[in-house]
């Protein structure tokens, strides 16, 4: 098996296959964990994304619903990953809070929770008095929240390298700086041509993240995946205050505190693209609005010093639905694309693909 892409899904898949004795080569065009898998903010999600629910509506939410089962199964794998990989990945599953500040927002979070319940995701509504005891760090104008216990965080700088290290110990050949230039579909198997030479195999798995589409095009497959530019922020370390993964029902927000005390603030706010170089640039408007939402939800953040804001690409689709499995028209060619929530869904995506290949 040749795996294209050294992010969380590619490295986890290499590890799972190697555990079962499969001969695996992983090709990475740059460095491992150098794109979305390492540049995301480390949230482990279990809910329908609220901002998207508001944008796309209840019909879309029902279509997205089955993806919640994948996310739930992935969270179950996350609970075991540190033991399997024998290392601390700073995984904490203390639950997520979607907070509301007015009756309109309360109505919306209840409507979303009702749909999630149909797919086995059971959130608990907390009123203002309950929140004061449960999460006293929230602003006083917060009037309620939905709490889902199966959410949390992990350190994205540690997870993918840990999978890769174990995979290499098990015999996986990882070739870095190997950009794929073409794929030849042979009568039996494939030839993958790269800047580090050509490789032959029986099966190819496309785990190339934002480049899934360009790899698919090499074998004539249609593409639904595109790259979306977003940015995140991190503060200086502060005294431990926030236990949960925090969302806002008002505007985009994900907020969590790392084990080292820093706050990571995101939510999918867009960044800019230099039209000449193609490089990503910080969007000042997104920066201000994101931090305004964050301090409005957790007022103690107003005294925090910001350390860094960074832009990154995330792989996306219009419908947010994962693409996992073997191409109908090309036997032995598999695709893995888990849009927007790929850090959460990486382990289960890899496990599913490994089971498909092994069967």
Positions of PLM-derived features:
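N-terminal Rossmann-like FAD-binding beta1-loop-alpha1 element of flavoenzymes
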Residues: 1-26
């Amino acid at each position: 098996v040749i795996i294209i892409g050294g992010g969380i899904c590619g490295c986890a898949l290499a590890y799972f296959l190697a555990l079962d004795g499969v001969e695996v080569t992983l090709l990475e065009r740059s460095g491992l964990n150098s794109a979305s898998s390492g540049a995301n903010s480390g949230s482990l999600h279990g809910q329908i994304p609220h901002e998207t629910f508001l944008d796309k509506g209840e019909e879309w939410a029902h279509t997205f619903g089955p993806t919640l089962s994948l996310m739930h199964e992935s969270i179950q794998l996350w609970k075991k990953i540190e033991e399997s990989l024998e290392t601390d990945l700073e995984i904490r599953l203390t639950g997520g809070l979607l907070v509301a500040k007015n009756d309109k927002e309360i109505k919306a979070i209840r409507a979303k929770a009702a749909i999630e319940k149909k797919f086995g995701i059971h959130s608990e509504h907390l009123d203002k008095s309950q929140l004061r005891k449960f999460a006293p760090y929230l602003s006083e104008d917060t009037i309620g929240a939905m709490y889902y216990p199966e959410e949390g965080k992990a350190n994205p700088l540690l997870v993918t390298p840990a999978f890769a290290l174990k995979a290499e110990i098990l015999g996986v050949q990882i070739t870095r700086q190997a950009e794929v230039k073409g794929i030849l579909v042979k009568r039996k198997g494939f030839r993958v041509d790269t800047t580090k030479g050509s490789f032959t195999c029986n099966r190819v798995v496309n785990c190339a993240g934002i480049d899934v589409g360009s790899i698919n095009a090499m074998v004539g497959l249609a593409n639904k995946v595109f790259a979306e530019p977003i940015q995140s922020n991190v503060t200086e370390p502060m005294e431990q205050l926030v236990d949960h993964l925090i969302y806002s029902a008002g505007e985009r927000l994900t907020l969590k505190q790392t084990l080292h005390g820093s706050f990571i603030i995101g939510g999918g706010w867009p960044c800019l693209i230099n039209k000449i170089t193609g490089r990503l640039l910080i969007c000042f408007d997104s920066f201000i609005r994101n931090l305004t939402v964050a301090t409005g939800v957790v007022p103690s953040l107003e005294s925090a010093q910001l350390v860094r804001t960074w832009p990154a690409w995330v792989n996306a689709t219009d419908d947010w639905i994962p693409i996992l499995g073997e191409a109908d028209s090309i036997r032995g060619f598999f695709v893995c694309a888990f849009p927007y929530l790929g850090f959460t869904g990486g382990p289960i995506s890899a496990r599913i693909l490994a089971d498909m290949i092994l069967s």
